[in-house]
Amino acid sequence: MKNTIIKGLTDLVEQKRDNLIRQVVVQLEAQGYKAVLEQATVQQFCRQFALSPVEFALRCLPVAACYALTPISQFNVGAIAIGQSGSFYFGANQEFVAASMQQTVHAEQSAISHAWLAGEKAIAHMVVNYTPCGHCRQFMNELNSAERLKIHLPHSQNNLLHNYLPDAFGPKDLNIQNVFFDGQSHPFNYQGHDPLIRAAVEAASQSYAPYSQAFSGVALQLGELIICGRYAENAAFNPTFLPLQSALNYQRLQGLIDVKVSRVVMAEAKADLTSLPMTQSLAGAHLGLDIEYISL
């Protein structure tokens, strides 16, 4: 079966007949379909086409939407998180057959988690092809850049996040000072030699769980590669992003959807709640695998 991302990008180039889109797709192909444009590449495109970074990102939204996985809704949403570094991190919505609707990844979550795992320190702009839903507005309010974050839509640009979420409730209301995208370090010890377990423990140590202390991470084995995901809590609790979604999203945006996952390890700190049941459910439904669980 043909890679659905490659097929979507190929079809987009043929349908749009847009030189900018064609060149962006060529760039993605050259980097193995990793859905990121580094700052230097962004600057090069902006100079070539006489566009601002936000204008360029708006033109790239159909490309980002090609990374969507929407077997249920058939409604593809693309998002681009522009980091303070100037790099573009693409994201897209993802739905999982035979799993609950609550397991869905929203495009804004996708782009933000992508940037976080890539080491970005703050998000300056969110560019998305449809108005953010309430869930995503609350998710973005957890960011260390929430007060100055700008939202850009095809029909409306330069809107502060808090214009979409007035009188917002967030981490500061719960006396949390070190927020999402601020450095996280919660060292957990693992004395074994299994690199996949070690990677899951390291992901847990960098996760964001100020409300429950249920720090967790997931590591996926893809041939010789390891892909990790991190847990990220939210002041409103429900918009919390689970570590397996984070890992599957990163796998997709690294252009690795054709590489089979053979193992899933989850490492989680002991706390009053756990993400294990939902993680087990999604791993079984989407990957046909059991979770190897490490209690920290």
Curated annotation (Swiss-Prot):
A single MF term (Gene Ontology): zinc ion binding
EC number: 3.5.4.5
Entry cofactors: Zn(2+)
Pfam families recorded: dCMP_cyt_deam_1, dCMP_cyt_deam_2
Annotated residues for binding of Zn(2+): H106, C133, C136
InterPro entries linked: APOBEC/CMP_deaminase_Zn-bd (IPR016192), CMP_dCMP_dom (IPR002125), Cyd/dCyd_deaminase_Zn-bd (IPR013171), Cyt/Deoxycyt_deaminase (IPR050202), Cytidine_deaminase-like (IPR016193), Cytidine_deaminase_bacteria (IPR020797)
Gene Ontology CC annotation, any one: cytosol
Domain CMP/dCMP-type deaminase residue range list: 52-167, 191-296
Signal peptide: none
Residues of the active site: E108
EC class: hydrolase
GO BP term, pick one: cytidine deamination
Keyword Cell membrane tagged: no
Entry note: cofactor: Binds 1 zinc ion.
Binding-site residues, substrate: N93, Q94, E95
Keywords attached to this entry: Hydrolase, Metal-binding, Zinc
Function: This enzyme scavenges exogenous and endogenous cytidine and 2'-deoxycytidine for UMP synthesis.
Family, per entry: Belongs to the cytidine and deoxycytidylate deaminase family.
Record protein name field: Cytidine deaminase
Organism: Mannheimia succiniciproducens (strain KCTC 0769BP / MBEL55E)
